């Protein structure tokens, strides 16, 4: 019977140990496991939320970059258009100024040509009178000279 009493003693000790473990040891272990599961689940949920937020932020950033690129292209196009307008205005002003300068040049050349032509007429008339005086051998009076010069200038 010794064997049976030992077996019963061991059964009672095991039952007490099991009851003690279930009552005092098992709840803190289960609580720690549940807390760990909860913290892991929360961490996974936070990671998923952060991944979702990162994806949303990335999408928003890409949209903003696209908008900025479009706006930059619009600004560049506007600047190019304005540059072309200014260039056209400057070219038109330059053409107008060029035409005005050429016209002034022609007017100055024409005035100079007329002045030189008039001087040439007077000199030709004076030379003609001088030649005529030498041929005739006498001097025509001053009033007659001026009269003859005026007539020659008018004829030329």
Swiss-Prot record:
Picking any one GO molecular function of the record gives: proton-transporting ATPase activity, rotational mechanism
The answer on whether this UniProt entry bears the keyword Membrane reads yes
Task: List, alphabetically, the InterPro entries matched.
Answer: ATP_synth_B-like_membr_sf (IPR028987), ATP_synth_b/b'su_bac/chlpt (IPR002146), ATP_synth_F0_bsu_bac (IPR005864), ATP_synthase_B_chain (IPR050059)
Membrane spanning stretches: 7-29
Q: Which Gene3D superfamilies match?
A: F1F0 ATP synthase subunit B, membrane domain (1.20.5.620)
- Location(s) in or outside the cell: Cell inner membrane
Cellular component, GO annotation? plasma membrane; proton-transporting ATP synthase complex
Q: Which domain of life is it from?
A: Bacteria
Task: Indicate where this protein is primarily found.
Answer: membrane
Which key words tag this protein in UniProt?
Answer: ATP synthesis, Cell inner membrane, Cell membrane, CF(0), Hydrogen ion transport, Ion transport, Membrane, Transmembrane, Transmembrane helix, Transport
Quick check: keyword Nucleotide-binding in the entry? no
Q: Describe its membrane topology.
A: Single-pass membrane protein
Free-text function comment from the UniProt entry: F(1)F(0) ATP synthase produces ATP from ADP in the presence of a proton or sodium gradient. F-type ATPases consist of two structural domains, F(1) containing the extramembraneous catalytic core and F(0) containing the membrane proton channel, linked together by a central stalk and a peripheral stalk. During catalysis, ATP synthesis in the catalytic domain of F(1) is coupled via a rotary mechanism of the central stalk subunits to proton translocation.
Quaternary assembly: F-type ATPases have 2 components, F(1) - the catalytic core - and F(0) - the membrane proton channel. F(1) has five subunits: alpha(3), beta(3), gamma(1), delta(1), epsilon(1). F(0) has three main subunits: a(1), b(2) and c(10-14). The alpha and beta chains form an alternating ring which encloses part of the gamma chain. F(1) is attached to F(0) by a central stalk formed by the gamma and epsilon chains, while a peripheral stalk is formed by the delta and b chains.
Task: List the NCBIfam families hit by this protein, alphabetically.
Answer: ATP_synt_b, PRK05759.1-2, PRK05759.1-4
The Swiss-Prot or TrEMBL record describes its family as follows:
Belongs to the ATPase B chain family.
Q: What is this protein called?
A: ATP synthase subunit b
Starting at the broadest rank, the lineage of the source organism is: Bacteria, Pseudomonadati, Pseudomonadota, Gammaproteobacteria, Pasteurellales
Gene that this sequence comes from:
atpF
């Amino acid at each position: 019977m010794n064997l049976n009493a030992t077996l019963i003693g061991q059964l009672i000790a095991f039952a007490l140990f099991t009851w003690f473990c279930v009552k005092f040891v098992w709840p803190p272990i289960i609580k720690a496991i549940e807390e760990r599961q909860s913290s892991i689940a929360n961490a996974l949920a936070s990671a998923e939320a952060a991944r979702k937020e990162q994806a949303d932020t990335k999408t928003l950033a890409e949209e903003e970059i696209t908008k900025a690129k479009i706006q930059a292209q619009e600004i560049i196009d506007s600047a190019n258009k304005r540059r072309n307008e200014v260039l056209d205005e400057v070219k038109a002003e330059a053409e107008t100024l060029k035409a005005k300068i050429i016209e002034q040049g022609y007017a100055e050349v024409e005035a100079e040509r007329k002045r030189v032509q008039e001087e040439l007429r007077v000199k030709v008339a004076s030379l003609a009178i001088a030649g005529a005086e030498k041929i005739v051998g006498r001097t025509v009076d001053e009033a007659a000279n001026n009269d003859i010069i005026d007539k020659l200038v008018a004829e030329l």
